[in-house]
């Protein structure tokens, strides 16, 4: 049976509130947490952006069984890959068997805060690939150096605090090239909700890459992040989407937009019809169950759900009681 996880939107809630929500989620049948790594919220209305690595340490210490990781960290701009490796190894040492490392190529909203030129997508992918190579070297526990890199330098060094086994590395992508590389070189894939046809294609590319590397893709985690809006009425659910998560209705890539204020200006153009086929908005819990079930049937091992409204306690209890128990194991 797929893990149903709670997507912790650190760009939307105070970190202490999110800890309480995750503890509540653990008591109501959620099995994992995917934590957003943001420097800024998407739009000012969301109101927060706590440091995910501090927060995950608290999450690990105040929950018992939840698996968790950042969804996702970019190891290329705000962080040097060696620092990401150290942070991940420390977290995995403190919560062995529970932590995974989610990595991606970054968004200007969060990474441009350190200045510099914002590269084209193919350059960001190359940077991610080089960064992953450094992280994997350090996870071995051996002395490593990286003095011939195109984008990064690292002196002769090793990690001194290591977990019993290295945390698995999952790569976030919505494109086929990165999906295939993730299958070859990493341990799992993370992707946002999309059409079944697109997701089927991405999983196929991921599996193709895994087979090229002699790995069994059936044993490699496939994670989905799913935004939705549930409330007691359709009108309330729609208003939550428009107010709290208008970025979910923007029909274009968002990696190059640089500030919450820029997003807010674009959000003024978002209308209810823009959410169609992008995010389920419904008061019907069985409709949400059926929506999640189709992704379980497609082959995802973990589905991390984010209800975009402020009604988090009601959402967690309702889904824990009436949605999660009624999901079936994959029929594929």
Description of each model-found segment:
Residues 1-332:
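Active-site-adjacent structural elements that line small-molecule/cofactor binding pockets in enzymes
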């Amino acid at each position: 049976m797929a893990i149903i996880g709670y997507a912790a939107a650190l760009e939307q809630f105070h970190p202490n509130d999110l800890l309480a929500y995750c503890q509540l989620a653990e008591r109501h049948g959620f099995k994992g947490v995917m934590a957003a790594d943001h420097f800024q919220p998407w739009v000012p209305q969301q109101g927060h952006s706590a440091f995910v690595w501090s927060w995950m340490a608290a999450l690990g210490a105040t929950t018992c069984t939840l698996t968790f990781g950042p969804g996702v960290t970019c190891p290329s701009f705000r962080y040097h890959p060696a620092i990401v490796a150290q942070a991940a190894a420390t977290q995995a040492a403190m919560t062995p068997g529970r932590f995974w490392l989610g990595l991606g190529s970054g968004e200007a909203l969060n990474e441009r805060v350190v200045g510099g030129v914002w590269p084209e997508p193919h350059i960001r992918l190359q940077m991610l690939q080089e960064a992953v190579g450094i992280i994997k070297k350090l996870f071995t526990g051996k002395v490593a150096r990286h003095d011939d890199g195109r984008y990064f330098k690292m002196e002769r060094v090793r990690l001194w605090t290591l977990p019993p086994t290295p945390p698995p590395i999952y790569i976030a992508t919505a494109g086929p090239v990165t999906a295939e590389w993730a299958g070859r070189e990493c341990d799992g894939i993370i992707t946002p909700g999309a059409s079944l046809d697109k997701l089927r294609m991405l999983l196929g590319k991921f599996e193709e890459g895994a087979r090229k590397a002699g790995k069994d893709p059936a044993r490699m985690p496939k994670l989905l992040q799913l935004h939705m809006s549930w409330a007691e009425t359709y009108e309330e659910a729609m208003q939550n989407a428009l107010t709290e998560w208008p970025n979910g209705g923007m029909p274009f890539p968002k990696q190059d937009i640089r500030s919450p204020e820029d997003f807010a200006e674009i959000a003024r153009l978002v209308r209810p019809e823009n959410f169609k086929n992008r995010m389920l908005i419904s008061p019907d819990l069985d409709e949400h169950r059926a929506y999640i079930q189709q992704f379980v049937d497609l082959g995802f091992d973990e589905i991390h759900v984010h209800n975009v409204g402020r009604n988090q306690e009601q959402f967690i209890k309702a889904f824990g009681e009436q949605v999660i128990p009624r999901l079936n194991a994959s029929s594929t």
